[in-house]
Regions:
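Short glycine-enriched loops at secondary-structure junctions
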Residues: 31-34, 109-113
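Gly/Ser/Thr-rich beta-alpha loop segments that engage phosphate groups in nucleotides
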Residues: 51-54, 88, 110, 114, ...
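S-adenosyl-L-methionine/SAH cofactor-binding core of RNA-modifying enzymes
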Residues: 56-109
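Structured adenosyl-cofactor binding patch, chiefly the S-adenosyl-L-methionine
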Residues: 113, 117-164
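SAM-dependent methyltransferases
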Residues: 179-230
């Protein structure tokens, strides 16, 4: 419902480069274009009572059908609805979805969307966490950004994306740049040693140390997978 929000995020992120260089295409559809009546109504009160407003099925259906036409049909197309009911979005899922050729995002608003739209069109629901936002543009763009940055050619170095937090199953290690000393705190000597094996060992130790301290849930999962894989 708020195309300007999406365009602003695209134009001020790596997504702009992806679009400019023809790596990806974005088509932003304004749900208001399919609204009913002089006021272009797109929401109404829920049947059965309750607070909040629900995005109506008819405008959504028309907008989705237009999107399906723009991407070339339903075959092989993922239709994603960011929702607290969905699978938790993760780096693993982002990596998998970065291989997709056609994705349609439905951005919810208000209390939610008519359930009949979910039943008819949505192929995947993803959650970015156990909290509620006022608009679906934010989670949709979060999901999109995490996918697109993994497509070859989007980042200057794909290695940068592959060595961020989580591909190791761990948080990322600390990073340092110039100057060597800031407020009497120096860069660890090992990073200046030029000894590749020692540097890699330090990075691995710091990833493990940071994950164990800051994300015990990830640490537990990491140990479980490590033991399972021998």
């Amino acid at each position: 419902p708020v195309p300007g929000t999406i365009e602003t995020l695209i134009e001020n992120s790596i997504l702009r480069k992806a679009r400019t260089e023809g790596i990806v295409q974005f088509h932003v559809i304004d749900l208001r274009d399919f609204g009913k009546g002089n006021y272009r109504q797109i929401d109404d009160k829920p049947f059965g009572g309750g607070d909040g407003m629900i995005l109506m099925a008819e405008p959504l259906s028309q907008a989705i059908e237009m999107a399906i036409g723009k991407v070339g049909g339903l075959e092989g197309t993922h239709i994603v609805f960011p929702s607290p009911s969905g699978q938790i979005w993760s780096q693993d899922v982002a990596t998998e979805c970065s291989q997709l050729e056609r994705v349609i995002f439905i951005c919810g608003h208000y209390k939610g969307i008519d359930e009949r739209i979910i039943e008819k069109y949505v192929t995947h629901e993803y959650s970015i966490g156990d909290f509620v936002l006022t608009s679906g543009e934010v989670p949709a763009m979060l999901i999109l950004d995490s996918m697109v940055r993994l497509i070859p050619g989007v980042l200057n170095s794909i290695e940068s994306a592959l060595t961020d937090s989580f591909p190791h199953g761990l948080l990322d290690h600390p990073h340092y740049t110039q100057p060597r000393i800031v407020d009497d705190v120096a860069v660890p000597d090992v990073l200046l040693s030029g000894h590749h094996a020692k540097i890699q060992k330090w990075k691995k130790e710091k990833r493990e140390e940071r994950t164990q301290k800051k994300r015990p849930d990830l640490w537990k999962k990491y140990l479980s997978e490590k033991n399972r894989n021998g």
